[in-house]
C-alpha cells in the first residue's frame, strides 16, 4: 500500500476502530522496525497506520510525514480522533505537529512520544519544538514514554520536555519505563548492520506490551489485549 507515489505504508486493523498513526525514527524507510508494536496495538482493538519516511531527504521528511497524516485521516472513519505516536526522531515530529496542529488544520485526540529526541530539531518545521511552546495554544494531551535504560536518547530529554509542556499549559503525562531505546518500540539494535530491526525476545515483548497498553489508553481503548 502507498500513501504517496513510491511511499509505502502498512495498515493494521479496521478503519472503524480508533486510529493510531505511528512514525518510526531516524532510520530511513523503517516501518518494519515497529511492526511488533503495531501488531500489539491492533490486537487491542486499534487501527494502525505505519508509513515509511525519510529523515535524510532534502526536506528532512516533512513531505512524507504530512502526506502520511492526510492518508491516515482519509483511511480512518474518525479522522478527528487520530492518535499520533512517534519513536525517537518520529516522537519529535509528532510533538512538533501537535504543537502546530491548528496551523495545519488538524485535530488530534492524543500524542504519544516514545523516547522522544527532543534535543534535536523537529523534522517538519526544522525548528526546536520547545522554543515554539510559548506561542502555542494547548490542545490535545501528551503522553511521554521513555526508558530508564535508554543510552541513545537520555530520559532527561523527556523530563525536560514534559516540564516545558506543563509550563506552557499543555496536559502532559511522563512515564519512565524499564526499557531501552529499541525495545520501547518493539525493536532492537543490530550492531553488525548498524540499524534497528523488529524483535521478539521475551523482554522486548514485555516492554512493547506495556507501551501498547499506554497507547491504547490514550486512544480510549482500555480492554486487555
Locations of the language-model features?
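Alpha/beta-hydrolase active-site loop
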Residues: 57-76
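Short beta-strand element of the alpha/beta-hydrolase
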Residues: 17-25
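N-terminal cap/lid segment of alpha/beta-hydrolase-fold proteins
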Residues: 1-15
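Conserved alpha/beta-hydrolase
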Residues: 42-57
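The serine-hydrolase catalytic nucleophile loop
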Residues: 27-38, 53, 156
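Primarily recognizes the serine-hydrolase "nucleophile elbow" in alpha/beta-hydrolase
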Residues: 70-132
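The feature captures the conserved acid-bearing segment of alpha/beta-hydrolase catalytic domains
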Residues: 115-168
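C-terminal catalytic histidine-bearing segment of alpha/beta-hydrolase fold enzymes
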Residues: 168-225
Amino acid at each position: 500500500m502507498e500513501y504517496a507515489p513510491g511511499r509505502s505504508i502498512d495498515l493494521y486493523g479496521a478503519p472503524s476502530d480508533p486510529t493510531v498513526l505511528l512514525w518510526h525514527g531516524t532510520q530511513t524507510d523503517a516501518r518494519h522496525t515497529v511492526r511488533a508494536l503495531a501488531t500489539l496495538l491492533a490486537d487491542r482493538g486499534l487501527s494502525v497506520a505505519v508509513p515509511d519516511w525519510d529523515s535524510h531527504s532534502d526536506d528532512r521528511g516533512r513531505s512524507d510525514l504530512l502526506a502520511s497524516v492526510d492518508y491516515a485521516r482519509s483511511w480512518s472513519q474518525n479522522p478527528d480522533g487520530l492518535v499520533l505516536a512517534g519513536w525517537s526522531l518520529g516522537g519529535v515530529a509528532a510533538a512538533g505537529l501537535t504543537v502546530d496542529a491548528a496551523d495545519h488544520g488538524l485535530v488530534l485526540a492524543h500524542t504519544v512520544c516514545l523516547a522522544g529526541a527532543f534535543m534535536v530539531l523537529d523534522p517538519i518545521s526544522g525548528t526546536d519544538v520547545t522554543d515554539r511552546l510559548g506561542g502555542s495554544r494547548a490542545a490535545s494531551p501528551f503522553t511521554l514514554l521513555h526508558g530508564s535504560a535508554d543510552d541513545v536518547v537520555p530520559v532527561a530529554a523527556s523530563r525536560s520536555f514534559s516540564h516545558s509542556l506543563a509550563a506552557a499549559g499543555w496536559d502532559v503525562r511522563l512515564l519512565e519505563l524499564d526499557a531501552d531505546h529499541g525495545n520501547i518500540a518493539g525493536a532492537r539494535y543490530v550492531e553488525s548492520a548498524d540499524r534497528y530491526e523488529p524483535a521478539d525476545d521475551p523482554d522486548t515483548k514485555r516492554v512493547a506490551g506495556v507501551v501498547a497498553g499506554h497507547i491504547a489508553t490514550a486512544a480510549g481503548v482500555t480492554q486487555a489485549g
